[in-house]
Amino acid sequence: MSDAHYDMHKRNGYSSDEPYPEIKVLGPNKYYAELLMDDYAGISSEFTSVNQYLYHNFDLDETHRELSEMWINISITEMLHMEILAKTIRLLGGNPVYRGSTSSCGAYWNGGFVCYGNSICNRLKLDLHLEHVAINNYYKDISLIEDPYIKAILNRIILDEKLHVSLFEKAIEKYCK
């Protein structure tokens, strides 16, 4: 699969305009692969984000089409991040099964990682928090990884996550007065 595939699947308004870097690594590194497993399918991961945002969308009624569109498009962007991370983990010599690393003590992903929430406002705040945690986790990984290609990948994903923060903040401003 070419790296142009990633840009082709970007969601207008839900992904940064910056192109994704080429998905490559300096060489196999199981330690880096394990670090990325938490971003991929750990507790506060892309896999959790996808499922949390989809659930929040599924539980909406027809009167909130704008929120529904936002949650669906952000979840699709998070799926793209999962695909990018899976490819990177494979290149590093890892196996991108649905499990975390240190965040979940290596346990497989489960629906208990999702914060389901009980109202639109509560859900938006939970989603905003999840994006902040993801950004912090990516920055932590960048500080531990010495591979410039992986750093470029993570920095590019962070651009999308920061856009998601902005979208959730705007939605909170609109729906949580």
Language-model segment annotations:
Residues 1-177:
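Non-heme di-metal
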